[in-house]
Structures are given as C-alpha cells and as structure tokens.
Amino acid sequence: SAGRECDIAVDHSEFTNLPQAQIDECVAIMKAAGMNATVSSIHINGWFGAHNKLEGARWITRELFDIDLDATLARWVYIGDSTNDQQMFEHMPHSVGVANIARFVPQLAHLPRYVTHGERGAGFAELARAILAARP
C-alpha cells in the first residue's frame, strides 16, 4: 500500500500495564524524534511518514475495489477502539466504537457516533450481527 511498511510498537496494555504518564512520555519521545505516534488499545505505535488510517482506507478502496471512498461514505461503516481511530470517527458518518473505547473518551476530540455494548471482538460481533439483521 501507499502506507507505512513498518512501525515501532510499544506494549502498554497487552502484556503489561503502563501508567498514562509513561504512555504520554513514550509518545513525546517518538514525536521529538520526528515520528508520528498514536496510541491503540494495546500499543503505542510510532512511524515515519505521513500515513494514517484515513489515507489507507482511501487507498485500499480505490486500488482494490475501484471505489472513491469519499464519494461513497454512506455505504461504509468504521469500527475502532482507541485514540488512533479518532480521525476515522470524525470522517466516517457511520462510525462505531467498541465498549472499551470508554477508557479513551477523555482523550478523544472526535467520538464514534455509536458505541457497542460489547468490548473488543464481542463489540465487533455485535456490530456485524446488527448489520446482517438490517439487510433486506
């Protein structure tokens, strides 16, 4: 893709629990080194280049499906769980957060338009069931 080929991922919640101050410090160190940095539900990700989820979504819909994402936004739904999803929450009219997004709400400038009852994979499955049930 036109996106990043590699990044640095620092665990903050998968196998260890870093306090928010250490997460913030890690992000600051990455940014001071000229990297982009975001925080997911389990990792701090840092990378060089101007790549982001929205540009990646535009690229993949164009290259794989010959579809202009921005011209067809009403046909798409985006689901996320962390601060690194807020650009997509802002851009996508059908944006969903899984329940564990709640811990990141104080840090989000842009919230999902809907939040599932289930966390993580259960929240994704909840959304999938709702979409399938709504099909004609």
Per-region residue spans from a language model:
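Generic secondary-structure transition motif, activating predominantly at the C-termini of alpha-helices
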Residues: 30-34, 109-112, 132
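Residue-level detector of flexible, active-site-proximal loop/helix-junction positions
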Residues: 44, 102, 120-122
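Acidic, Mg2+-coordinating phosphoryl-transfer loop and its flanking beta/alpha structural elements
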Residues: 57, 75-118
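Glycine-rich phosphate-binding/hydrolytic loop that grips phosphoryl groups
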Residues: 113-135
